[in-house]
From Swiss-Prot:
It comes from the Eukaryota. Interacts with ABCC9. It catalyses: K(+)(in) = K(+)(out). InterPro entries: Ig_E-set, IRK_C, K_chnl_inward-rec_Kir, K_chnl_inward-rec_Kir6.1, K_chnl_inward-rec_Kir_cyto, Kir_TM. The lineage of its organism: Eukaryota, Metazoa, Chordata, Craniata, Vertebrata. This is ATP-sensitive inward rectifier potassium channel 8. Residues 127-138, 139-145 dip into the membrane without crossing it.
Length: 424
């Protein structure tokens, strides 16, 4: 059988195969850099190979609070069920040892009414009734159908023990639920940070800036901001320090170093000789393996609990030569905040060199500002010339349209032979 000929020419197939072989190898996308603090404020750290797990049980209350909600609710339910079942078994054993169960089984009708003074617990005939009595004792429901008598001192001991255990379980579990609902990090959900940080010139100095705001009307009392740079460093002895933390001072004119977070604020750090960013230029920033961690702490006005909000900025999230736009305006005697522009930035003139080079050569800043002013003036000239050209073109088009709309004059003869001119 003859083979079917291909519809595609063989020359085209060979050329296509050769072209695919000559293609450059595909470069994999660069993996995202690991960060210690996520944008949401969670710590991106995994604990492995912990041998002494029993240390968590030494502080059982904190362990219960730190658990997830589904685990906490399961433990909450199981603690009550297990205590009810445990004491139900004890009540059934007390009734069984005293012979109350056999007494209820042997006698019936009017004879059972005489047993109320001789049994330990009235109306406990089976394990089900013992379980119901255990719930009534611990939760203090008090239906009245089952009650204790003075016949069994052991039953009195079990009653006291169950009350003590029930109070302990209520205190621990209800306190755990309350602490989980009133945790301080819940308040931090309404404390927001700008997605990007910027580096620009302010008051003649290069500054690292970011914006922070509070969405609630209730204030954060004694709010303070701390900034740290975390990066990998190598000592002169060759030791590699994977987590090297360096504090960054915050430029705050208030001596107490607290901020009044009534409206979104731009937190500024002046890049000077004390700053870890002093030797970093715009070109070096893209290759830097650093992370700027921001910590906002304060006291919640309504609850008095100390709260903390965190975020971080890696090198890719720091915009050089940008500035935050203004979002606070005054409208009819009231200050208004437009949160839709919370993280918006605009490009501004900023030298691309490091702060060290800027201190050594202050003329760089003057030249940058002059170039920016010239480019701004040129853009204004171009804009004005474009406006003039557009207006001239518009006027010319209007004139042409008016000339085309002029009404022509028509001449016609009257019966007397005179010519009259009229416009149609």
């Amino acid at each position: 059988m003859l083979a079917r000929k291909s519809i595609i020419p063989e020359e085209y197939v060979l050329a296509r195969i050769a072209a695919e072989n000559l293609r450059k190898p595909r470069i994999r996308d660069r993996l995202p850099k690991a960060r210690f603090i996520a944008k949401s404020g969670a710590c991106n750290l995994a604990h492995k190979n912990i041998r002494e797990q029993g240390r968590f049980l030494q502080d059982i209350f904190t362990t219960l609070v730190d658990l997830k909600w589904r685990h906490t609710l399961v433990i909450f339910t199981m603690s009550f069920l297990c205590s009810w079942l445990l004491f139900a078994i004890m009540w059934w054993l007390v009734a069984f040892a005293h012979g109350d169960i056999y007494a209820y089984m042997e006698k019936s009708g009017m004879e059972k009414s005489g047993l109320e003074s001789t049994v330990c617990v009235t109306n406990v005939r089976s394990f089900t009734s013992a379980f119901l009595f255990s719930i009534e004792v611990q939760v203090t429901i008090g239906f009245g159908g089952r009650m204790m008598t003075e016949e069994c001192p052991l039953a009195i001991t079990v009653l006291i023990l169950q009350n003590i255990v029930g109070l302990i379980i209520n205190a621990v579990m209800l306190g755990c639920i309350f602490m989980k609902t009133a945790q301080a990090h819940r308040r931090a959900e309404t404390l927001i940070f700008s997605r990007h940080a910027v580096i620009a010139v302010r008051n003649g100095k290069l500054c690292f800036m970011f914006r922070v705001g509070d969405l609630r009307k209730s204030m954060i009392i004694s709010a303070s901001v701390r900034i740290q740079v975390v990066k990998k460093t190598t000592t002169p002895e060759g030791e590699v320090v994977p987590i090297h933390q360096l504090d960054i001072p915050v430029d705050n004119p208030i001596e107490s170093n607290n901020i009044f977070l009534v409206a979104p604020l731009i937190i500024c750090h002046v890049i000077d000789k004390r700053s870890p960013l002093y030797d970093i230029s715009a070109t070096d920033l893209a290759n830097q393996d650093l992370e700027v961690i921001v910590i906002l702490e304060g006291v919640v006005e309504t609850t008095g609990i100390t709260t903390q909000a965190r975020t971080s900025y890696i090198a890719e999230e720091i915009q050089w030569g940008h500035r935050f736009v203004s979002i606070v305006t005054e409208e009819e005697g009231v200050y208004s905040v437009d949160y839709s522009k919370f993280g918006n930035t605009v490009k501004v003139a900023a030298p691309r060199c490091s702060a060290r080079e800027l201190d050594e050569k202050p003329s760089i800043l003057i030249q940058t500002l002059q170039k920016s002013e010239l480019s701004h003036q040129n853009s204004l000239r171009k804009r004005n010339s474009m406006r003039r050209n557009n207006s001239m073109r518009r006027n010319n088009s209007i004139r042409r349209n008016n000339s085309s709309l002029m009404v022509p004059k028509v001449q016609f003869m009257t019966p007397e032979g005179n010519q009259n001119t009229s416009e149609s």
